[in-house]
Each structure stands twice: as C-alpha cells, then as structure tokens.
C-alpha cells in the first residue's frame, strides 16, 4: 500500500535511487497504490552524472511492496521493501536492467518489458 509521501527504492539502473510518491494515477481520488499501479513521483536521491536528476518529476510502476499481495489461490506475497521502476509515457522502462524479484501480476498488466528484464519473477 503506497500513498502520497511514501518513499520507494528504485529497482532499475535509470539513475534514480529513491522516489517519493506524489500522486496515484487512475481514479481521481485513489488513496492507495499496490503492485502494478502507475504513480507520479519525485526523485529524492539520484546517482551523479546520470540523465535523471534530483527533484525531477517522473512516472513509475510499483514492483514490490511491504504490504502483502493476496493472490486468488490464497497465497500471500510480501517483499522486504517498497520499490518501483521508472517508466516513460508509453510505459517502457527508462533503465536497461531491473534489480530484485518482481511479482507475476505485472505480466497480466502489460508490463512485459519490465518482466523480461527482471532476474526473478515470483
């Protein structure tokens, strides 16, 4: 469950290290975002000499949350951190690598490029 003002780690090599959620895209008054939701975020920490800089507003898709994700078969999956992948306007990742495991639900939400870059899909 990600809400505005939540800090997230960045799970790719786009140049950003930490994001802060400022808006959840979708309905006009969504309170929380889960895995697979697109958010508007601001970069709080960035790697020097990279295209993305601090205080830049970007879009990202959430790939891991500490709040457990309940699947239809009854299984619950929980990760150690809140993480997102930086995307462009078309939904393609800005980085060329994705770090850490991501949820299988991203494939059903048409983020297949992110799923193909991930080392592990749970």
Curated annotation (Swiss-Prot):
Q: Which InterPro entries match?
A: Ribosomal_uL14, Ribosomal_uL14_bac-type, Ribosomal_uL14_CS, Ribosomal_uL14_sf
Location within or outside the cell:
Plastid, Chloroplast
Give the principal location in a single coarse category: plastid
- Record's keyword annotation contains Ribosomal protein: yes
Which GO terms fall under biological process for this protein?
translation
Q: One Gene Ontology cellular component annotation?
A: chloroplast
**Any idea which UniProt keywords this protein has?**
Chloroplast, Plastid, Ribonucleoprotein, Ribosomal protein, RNA-binding, rRNA-binding
What is the annotated role of this protein in its UniProt record?
Binds to 23S rRNA.
Among NCBIfam families, the record links this protein to: rplN_bact
Q: How does it assemble?
A: Part of the 50S ribosomal subunit.
Per the record, the similarity remark reads:
Belongs to the universal ribosomal protein uL14 family.
Q: What is this protein called?
A: Large ribosomal subunit protein uL14c
């Amino acid at each position: 469950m990600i809400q505005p003002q939540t800090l997230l780690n960045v799970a790719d090599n786009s140049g950003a290290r930490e994001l802060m959620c400022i808006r959840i895209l979708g309905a006009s008054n969504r309170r929380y975002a889960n895995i697979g939701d697109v958010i508007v975020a601001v970069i709080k920490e960035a790697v020097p000499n990279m295209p993305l800089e601090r205080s830049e507003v970007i879009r990202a898709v959430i790939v891991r949350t500490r709040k457990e994700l309940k699947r239809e078969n009854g299984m619950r999956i929980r990760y150690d951190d809140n993480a997102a992948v930086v995307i462009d306007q078309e939904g393609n990742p800005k980085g060329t690598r994705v770090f850490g495991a991501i949820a299988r639900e991203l494939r059903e939400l048409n983020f297949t490029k992110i799923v193909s870059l991930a080392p592990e899909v749970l």
